């Protein structure tokens, strides 16, 4: 027969798992992150993007702080390691779009890991969000023939 401590730990674990599953499902109902996975060439300045799109009656808070922290793989040089609201290339109540400028210094499959911080709101409530996302980059050597 399980002890009270074992039962308590199992119950707490189940509640936490349920909360996390609900939070993840809830986030998908509030917003969508649209990634701009791209192809790049070594040495060429390239841009990719991350768009925060509101869903289900929610909107992107146009006054709250917003940022995108960038951590690129080796072989990727970014122009700015942290983008803020001032760096948005498009902003409406329904979406916010960051353009991420970078230069690849070596070929291969690369990633720019990002942490987006923003606030989503409805008429009576707001929800601060921190979301991690990876932008995929396929880098080809300079002068390599382009794939069709």
Where are these regions (language model features)?
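Extracellular/lumen-exposed scaffold segments
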Residues: 26-148
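N-terminal secretory signal peptides that target proteins for export/translocation
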Residues: 1-5
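Bacterial N-terminal signal peptides
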Residues: 10-21
């Amino acid at each position: 027969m399980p002890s009270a401590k074992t039962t308590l730990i199992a119950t707490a674990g189940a509640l936490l798992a349920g909360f996390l599953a609900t939070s993840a499902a809830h986030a998908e109902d509030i917003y969508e992150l649209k990634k701009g996975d791209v192809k790049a060439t070594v040495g060429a300045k390239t841009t990719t993007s991350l768009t925060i799109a509101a869903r289900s009656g929610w909107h992107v808070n146009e006054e709250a702080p917003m940022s995108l922290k960038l951590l690129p793989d080796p072989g990727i040089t970014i122009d700015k390691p942290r983008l803020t609201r001032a760096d948005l290339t498009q902003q409406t109540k329904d979406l916010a779009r960051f353009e991420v400028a970078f230069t690849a210094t070596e070929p291969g499959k690369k990633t720019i890991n990002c942490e987006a911080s923003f606030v989503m709101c409805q008429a009576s409530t707001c929800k601060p969000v921190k979301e991690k996302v990876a932008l995929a980059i396929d880098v080809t050597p300079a002068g390599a023939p382009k794939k069709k």
